[in-house]
């Protein structure tokens, strides 16, 4: 703060204040310093720290040259109706589009696709976790189904230790997913079905409704999942020049790191929390 010798008024250096605010904000986000830590460092109150953080304006912009991109896309939720959709370029290790959302719907993915295309980006391939309908938002673009999520789907239907021999065999085939190719995997899946197709057709009577239903519903669902997703399980092998990952691990890992950093600052207001998330989405910038 400066005093004018002529009029005796005090003035603030706005640029200096702005730099100070940015420095405090980056320490708060990237160094995980709390209100108390920052108040102690700057010799001020925690209320002053909070007011300083609230002055910060974050821009939903990431700087990246227009270019063809491979996109890993998914939604994560911090609480009910408080979610975040992110498009990440795994080869660049950058988040290139995001939006806070209350739910996960196909039209939100379409919004992200249109935004990138409007700004001069070409999506060469998309990696998804297999949620129903999302692939339709990227019609005409090579789509890769995440191997980890496919294995989790099978595990959910068959459990970790299935008792039925048919389930055990199908689980063994699924376990080879990351170490095989489309031809071998397809042949194994067809051979499994030929062996167990009569078993899959077995029905039982429900005495309460007096209706017939399939006896091995979960096993049928597990097989149907593999059969439905088969055209998208080995896309990464068909386009080696694009370096398409076969999992969404790049984005899953970022989400885990994001939530870990946010949890340090529990009790954040929604507005302040969104500022922190946007700063983390844009990438690490250490304070000076």
Q: How does the language model describe each region?
A:
Residues 1-82:
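Short, positively charged, Gly/Tyr-enriched micro-motifs
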Residues 10, 141-144, 264:
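Short, surface-exposed beta-strand-loop junctions and turns on beta-sheet-rich folds
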Residues 21, 25, 121-132, 138, ...:
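Acidic/histidine-rich catalytic cores and adjacent linkers
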Residues 21, 33-37, 94-98, 174-178:
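Short acidic, glycine/Ser/Thr-rich loop/turn "cap" segments at secondary-structure junctions
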Residues 42, 119-121, 141:
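A structural signal for short coil/turn segments at secondary-structure junctions
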Residues 48-132, 136, 229, 250:
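RNase H-like nuclease fold core
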Residues 125-171:
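Conserved beta-strand -> loop -> alpha-helix junction used to position metal-binding or nucleic-acid-contacting
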């Amino acid at each position: 703060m400066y005093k004018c010798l002529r009029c005796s008024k005090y003035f603030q250096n706005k640029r200096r204040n702005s730099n100070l605010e940015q420095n405090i904000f980056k320490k708060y986000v990237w160094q995980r310093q709390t209100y108390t830590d920052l108040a102690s460092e700057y010799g001020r109150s925690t209320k002053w720290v909070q007011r300083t953080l609230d002055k910060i304006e974050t821009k939903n912009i990431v700087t990246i040259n227009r270019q063809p991109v491979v996109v890993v896309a998914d939604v994560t939720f911090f609480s009910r109706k408080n979610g975040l959709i992110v498009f990440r370029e795994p080869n660049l290790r950058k988040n290139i589009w995001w939006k806070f959302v209350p739910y996960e719907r196909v039209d939100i993915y379409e919004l992200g696709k249109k935004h990138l295309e409007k700004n001069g980006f070409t999506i060469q391939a998309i990696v998804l976790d297999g949620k129903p309908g999302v692939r339709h938002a990227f019609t005409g673009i090579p789509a890769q189904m995440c191997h980890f999520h496919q294995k989790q789907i099978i595990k959910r239907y068959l459990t970790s230790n299935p008792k039925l021999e048919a389930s055990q065999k199908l689980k063994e085939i699924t376990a080879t997913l990351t170490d095989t190719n489309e031809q071998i995997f397809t042949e194994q899946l067809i051979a499994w079905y030929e062996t167990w197709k009569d078993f899959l057709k077995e029905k039982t009577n429900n005495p309460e409704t007096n209706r017939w239903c399939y006896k091995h519903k979960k096993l049928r669902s597990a097989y149907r999942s593999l059969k439905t997703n088969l055209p998208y399980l080995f896309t990464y092998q068909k386009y080696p020049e694009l370096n398409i990952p076969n999992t969404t691990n790049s984005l899953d890992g970022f989400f885990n790191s994001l939530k870990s950093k946010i949890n340090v600052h529990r009790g954040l207001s929604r507005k302040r929390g969104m500022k922190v998330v946007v700063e983390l989405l844009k990438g690490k910038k250490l304070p000076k």
